[in-house]
């Protein structure tokens, strides 16, 4: 997406700052998990607090790059990103790993690519639901569940308010049992 920084070194710097802060956040959450498992609660909390700070720093730079849109735009961008990951990035990584004698890593790249493909499909399906106003309404009768309290409603639409906990329809999703 074009910004006032497009084509400048500042744009590259913003992209690098976003990437660096994003990677730092992930590392610190991993480090927090290790510290917690080893019994260092204070250190774990400091890693997590710093990770949360890094997330906000990354958000500053991503917003400057106009990286955050409305939900439909974000779903489209997410789907496009996942498409790149499974069709190009991981496919290329797997090919390189194979050529360099790392067949196990190549296989893992391919497995992750398959997951990224599923992510793309999920985002595209959700985007279609947003674009067709089908997130909270369907043409056929469905079972809707309040994500807050678990109340079940059967009908073509989620209710405007949950009759049990009074949360808005934004808290409803299609009910599925996976057991």
PLM-predicted stretches and their roles:
Residues 1-179:
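Non-heme di-metal
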């Amino acid at each position: 997406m074009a910004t006032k920084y497009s084509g400048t070194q500042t744009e590259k710097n913003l992209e690098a700052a976003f990437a660096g802060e994003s990677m730092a956040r992930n590392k610190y959450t991993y480090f927090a998990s290790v510290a917690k498992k080893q019994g260092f609660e204070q250190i774990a909390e400091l890693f997590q607090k710093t990770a949360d700070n890094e997330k906000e720093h990354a958000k500053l730079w991503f917003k400057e790059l106009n990286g955050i849109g409305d939900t439909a735009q974000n779903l489209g961008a997410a789907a496009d990103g996942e498409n790149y990951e499974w069709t190009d990035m991981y496919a290329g990584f797997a090919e390189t790993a194979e050529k360099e004698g790392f067949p196990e890593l190549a296989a893992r790249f391919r497995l992750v690519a398959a997951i990224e493909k599923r992510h793309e499909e999920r985002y595209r399906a959700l985007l279609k639901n947003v674009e067709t106003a089908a997130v909270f309404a369907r043409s056929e009768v469905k079972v809707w569940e309040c994500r807050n309290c678990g109340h079940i409603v059967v009908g073509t639409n989620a209710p405007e308010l949950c009759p049990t906990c009074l949360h808005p329809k934004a808290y409803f999703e299609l009910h599925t049992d996976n057991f």
